[in-house]
């Protein structure tokens, strides 16, 4: 749902995302050049043009890749974080990455699994998730509360989202909240400049990090949504 400007428009910009500052420049330019003064109509026109020129940077990136035949997933967590090279670790990372790719190509696909990296402080767990996201703007570790009405803003434009603080302070109640949150396949909300709320299928997946081995409280119903992998960076 984010609007991007991907071509030069005559003034310096820090990113491709359309910002309020960009809108001010555009409104001033259109008024001085063409005498257009209706902000509402200009925003409507921008929305129509954006809708007719949709693109998906993550899909475009993934489609541009060519596999060279080298096995990587099995040894990835060992290489970066010293995790064991075994079938469990391999299947855990493969499942997580398949979920991320599926959500990118088929938004709203059911995927309620969280890969949880467990190891000492400074092990590089957060950095690993950031690297998996490929680009900094596709990663976020800013998700602090799940009961915030504006939590959807923390998901917009991101592909891999780390829950670190929530996992660090998890208790039985908060774990149930996280499990319920992971089970959602979409959010329903209205974005700025729109009048009506709409379904927004999820295009992201969630990773967890913890320094403690016992970060999951005892749950008789099971904690199947959380897949912990021990990491040993000293190895």
Where do the model's predicted regions map?
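Conserved AAA+/SF3 P-loop NTPase catalytic/coupling segment centered on the Walker-B
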Residues: 159-182, 216-222
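Conserved catalytic/switch belt of AAA+ P-loop NTPases
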Residues: 175-198
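A short helix-turn-beta junction within AAA+ P-loop NTPase domains corresponding to the substrate/partner-engaging
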Residues: 216-235
């Amino acid at each position: 749902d984010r609007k991007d400007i991907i071509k030069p428009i005559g003034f310096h910009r820090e990113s491709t995302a359309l910002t309020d500052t960009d809108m001010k420049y555009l409104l001033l330019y259109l008024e001085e050049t063409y005498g257009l003064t209706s902000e509402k109509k200009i925003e409507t026109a921008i929305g129509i043009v954006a809708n007719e020129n949709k693109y998906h940077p993550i899909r475009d990136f993934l489609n541009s890749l060519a596999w060279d035949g080298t096995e990587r997933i099995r040894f990835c967590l060992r290489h970066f974080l010293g995790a064991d090279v075994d079938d469990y670790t391999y299947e855990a990372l493969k499942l997580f990455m398949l979920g991320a790719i599926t959500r990118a190509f088929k938004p709203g696909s059911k995927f309620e699994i969280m890969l949880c990296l467990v190891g000492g402080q400074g092990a590089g767990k957060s950095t690993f998730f950031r690297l998996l996201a490929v680009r900094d703007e596709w990663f976020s570790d800013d998700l602090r509360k799940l009961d915030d009405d504006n939590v959807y803003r923390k998901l917009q434009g991101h592909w891999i989202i780390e829950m670190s603080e929530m996992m660090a302070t998890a208790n039985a109640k908060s774990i149930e909240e996280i499990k319920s949150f992971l089970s959602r396949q979409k959010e329903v909300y209205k974005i700025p400049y729109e009048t009506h709320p709409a379904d927004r299928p999820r295009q992201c997946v969630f990773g967890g990090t913890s320094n403690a081995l016992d970060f999951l409280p005892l749950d008789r119903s099971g904690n199947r949504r959380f897949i912990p992998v021990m990491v040993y960076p000293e190895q």
